Every structure is written in structure tokens, then in C-alpha cells.
């Protein structure tokens, strides 16, 4: 039997598994079955806590989408990861350093119950996102057989494309998201953000996630939207991001500087399941 915990960050929900005290392995087929909301546990992503690969770090953090594919990063998941390892007694630290397949992150548990995550320095170089473009631009033209889109692009350890919309509530997230998430100019696929700028310190956002479709919240998507909005001269250093599942606070001092994200992490229940 595998012990697990169900958690969520603003409705972006996770099955979190301790791979430190349990010997676990998940095949893509098993993950897809577990992710099924009718016949399994049901989640957007599976988060796996592993021992550190580096003695200077506390844990290794792995993320699997509902389709079974492993991805580089998940900001909402990182907050839940921090709360999980502390709640389960895997650490007594309030400041936790972890590695992911994309790099290293620092997670800080706050007194009010929220978690602040150092998401690292945003990547704007197209070759590193990866995104097929000759050079970095504030805005790119993205063509499909149906229409042309204006977008910004950035990586927070995973690739993001951000579109400006006038009214995010009425944005065609499902159709446009499905169209762009596998666009040929993003060799590894892309998460697609739909951003409505309310004012320079406040945006509304919906995100179509690569491998998971639209979710109630996407932490890296919120970060990428603020990065793109700042680069385009629309947003301040600190921005409130309203997602369907709730609110995040993003703070970024500009190019070359790390980005900080603060938000909640909620425990739902503990369970066990036979694979």
C-alpha cells in the first residue's frame, strides 16, 4: 500500500507521496489511472518527495502531470511540497532548499500559514525556454492555420506563453489553449496564460496547462504572466494575481533577479492506495 496526502494550492490539486520513507515508483499508466477523478484519486499533478541528490539540499522535488508525463516545475505544488514535508516530520526547517529537474528552489513557510517560494530567475532567452525565435522580444507573433496571436514568452523552469485579453472571464481558454499548447515553435509544448491587466498592480489570469488543460490555478503561470507584463511595461514590481482558485502575490525586481511567489497550501486528507 502507498501512503499519500491530497493537497491543493488555490484549487490546483495534488497527490503528494513521500518517497523518502517509502520505496515508490509510478509508471505513466499508473499515474493516469490515479489521476482519474472517477476511478482514481483524482488530481492535476502527482508530487513525489525524494531524498536530495545534493548534500547541500533538503529534498528532490518531482512533478508528474495527469497524463503521466514528468514536468520541470510547479509553483502551486512547491508550496504544498513545503507544507507536506514539514507536516510529515521529514524536516523541522522553515526554510527548505530543494532541487527539481529544472534547477534549485528555496521554500519558506510563513507564520500566517502561507508559503513563499523563490522561483528562481525567469528565463527570457528563446533558446532556453525553449521557443523558436531569432532573438528575445517583448512580444512575439504566433501564427496558426486559423489566426495570429500576440504573446509574450518566458520560462519558470517550464515554458509559458502569455496572451493579453480584455475580459478573462470570456476568453476562449479551452480552444485557444489546446491550439497553442502544442504549437511547433514550442518544441516541448507550452503552458498558455490568458492575462487581463486590471491595473499595474493587479491582474486576472487563467491558464491552460500543458498535459492538464485548464486548472483552477497555476503558480508558474502567474509568475510568467507578471514577468511578461513587467517586460511589456504594464506591471509593477509587486502584483496581485487573481486566478479562478484564489489569489497569489508575485514580487519581481526585474531581469536577472529571482522571482518570489506567496500563496496558500491546503491539506485535504491522508489516504492509502494499492497500485
UniProtKB/Swiss-Prot annotation:
Q: What does this chain do?
A: Catalyzes the stereoinversion of LL-2,6-diaminopimelate (L,L-DAP) to meso-diaminopimelate (meso-DAP), a precursor of L-lysine and an essential component of the bacterial peptidoglycan.
Q: Where does it localize?
A: Cytoplasm
Q: What is its EC number?
A: 5.1.1.7
Catalysed reactions, as listed in the record: (2S,6S)-2,6-diaminopimelate = meso-2,6-diaminopimelate
- Please report the organism this UniProt entry assigns to the protein: Shewanella sp. (strain MR-4)
From the UniProt record, which GO molecular function terms apply?
diaminopimelate epimerase activity
Q: In this record, what's one Pfam family? A: DAP_epimerase
Q: Which GO terms describe its biological process?
A: lysine biosynthetic process via diaminopimelate
Gene that produces this protein = dapF
User: Which pathway or pathways does this protein act in?
Assistant: Amino-acid biosynthesis; L-lysine biosynthesis via DAP pathway; DL-2,6-diaminopimelate from LL-2,6-diaminopimelate: step 1/1
Where exactly is the site Could be important to modulate the pK values of the two catalytic cysteine residues?
Answer: 160, 209
Family classification: Belongs to the diaminopimelate epimerase family.
Alphabetical GO CC annotations of the entry are:
cytosol
Which EC class does it fall in? isomerase
Q: Where is this site: Important for dimerization?
A: 269
Q: How does it assemble?
A: Homodimer.
HAMAP family annotated for this entry? DAP_epimerase (MF_00197)
Q: Would you tell me the protein name for this molecule? A: Diaminopimelate epimerase
Ordered alphabetically, the record's keywords are: Amino-acid biosynthesis, Cytoplasm, Isomerase, Lysine biosynthesis
Q: Which residues bind substrate?
A: 12, 45, 65, 75-76, 158, 191, 209-210, 219-220
Amino acid at each position: 500500500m502507498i501512503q499519500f496526502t491530497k493537497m491543493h494550492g488555490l484549487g490546483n490539486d495534488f497527490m503528494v507521496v513521500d518517497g523518502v520513507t517509502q520505496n515508490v515508483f509510478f509508471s505513466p499508466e499508473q499515474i493516469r489511472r490515479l489521476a482519474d477523478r472517477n476511478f482514481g484519486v483524482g488530481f492535476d499533478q502527482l508530487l513525489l518527495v525524494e531524498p536530495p541528490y545534493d548534500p547541500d539540499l533538503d529534498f528532490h522535488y518531482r512533478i508528474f502531470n495527469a497524463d503521466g508525463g514528468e514536468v520541470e516545475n510547479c509553483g502551486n505544488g512547491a508550496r504544498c511540497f513545503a507544507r507536506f514535508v514539514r507536516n510529515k516530520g521529514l524536516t523541522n526547517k522553515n526554510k527548505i532548499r530543494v532541487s527539481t529537474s529544472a534547477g534549485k528552489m528555496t521554500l519558506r513557510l510563513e507564520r500566517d500559514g502561507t508559503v513563499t517560494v523563490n522561483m528562481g530567475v525567469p528565463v527570457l532567452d528563446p533558446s532556453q525556454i525553449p521557443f523558436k525565435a531569432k532573438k528575445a522580444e517583448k512580444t512575439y507573433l504566433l501564427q496558426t492555420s486559423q489566426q495570429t496571436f500576440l504573446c509574450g514568452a518566458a520560462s519558470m523552469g517550464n515554458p509559458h506563453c502569455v496572451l493579453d485579453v480584455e475580459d478573462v472571464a470570456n476568453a476562449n481558454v479551452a480552444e485557444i489553449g489546446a491550439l497553442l499548447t502544442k504549437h511547433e515553435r514550442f518544441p516541448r509544448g507550452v503552458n498558455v496564460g490568458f492575462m487581463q491587466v486590471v491595473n499595474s498592480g493587479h491582474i486576472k489570469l487563467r491558464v491552460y496547462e500543458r498535459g492538464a488543460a485548464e486548472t483552477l490555478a497555476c503558480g508558474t503561470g502567474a509568475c510568467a504572466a507578471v514577468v511578461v507584463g513587467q517586460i511589456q511595461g504594464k506591471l509593477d514590481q509587486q502584483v496581485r494575481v487573481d486566478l479562478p482558485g484564489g489569489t497569489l502575490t508575485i514580487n519581481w525586481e526585474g531581469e536577472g533577479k529571482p522571482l518570489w511567489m506567496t500563496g496558500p497550501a491546503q491539506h485535504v486528507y491522508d489516504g492509502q492506495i494499492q497500485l
